[in-house]
Amino acid sequence: HFLNAAGRNGAETIGKVIIAVDEVLAAEAPEAVLVLGDTNSCMAVIPAKRRKIPVFHMEAGNRCFDMRVPEEINRRIVDHTADVNLTYSSIAREYLLREGLPPDLVIKTGSPMYEVLSHYRSRIEQSDVLERLALKAGNYFLVSAHREENVDSERNYARLVAMLNAVAA
């Protein structure tokens, strides 16, 4: 399902996510919901819980301890609303236990990305993508700059690009 829930700001997006997910849950009637990560779409936890559908949160327990970060707010809401929290690391599990979550409902699974990378490692190593993009191994870096504090402000984005250019020089 494509939710088409983008809003003019975080609050509007979250509201649209809740409404759209509730409609999907009504139509599909799933036995459980798996929520992955900490983006605004993880607020799917709210309509699922309202419909008494069990929620599993994968990537639970991650913390930056900065409540100014929207994803940190989302993490805490989802972690404390989900029925079962699936953590990628021991430290993430420990954070949730310190926050009072029951140990039997906080399960360390490890990172599925590690499994994917391990599975495809030989194909990655044989890939000609560096050649096709005219890149030298060790002479480039990849940046994920999707956080709103980095990209929603032209000033912040320009500073980020300037910093990356300085590192690359």
Spell out what each predicted region is.
Residues H1-K16, A20, V24:
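Conserved nucleotide-sugar phosphate-binding/catalytic loop shared by glycosyltransferases and other
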Residues L3-A6, L36-G37, M58-G61:
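Short beta->alpha connector loops at strand-helix junctions that form conserved
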Residues N4-A5, T81-R159, M163:
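A nucleotide-sugar donor-handling region in carbohydrate enzymes
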Residues V24-E31, L135-K136:
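Glycine-rich phosphate-binding loop signature in dinucleotide/nucleotide-binding domains
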Residues L34-R51:
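An aromatic- and histidine-rich active-site surface loop
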Residues A48-G61:
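Active-site proximal beta-strand in glycosyltransferases
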Residues R63-D83:
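A conserved, positively charged/aromatic
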Residues L164-A169:
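A conserved nucleotide-sugar
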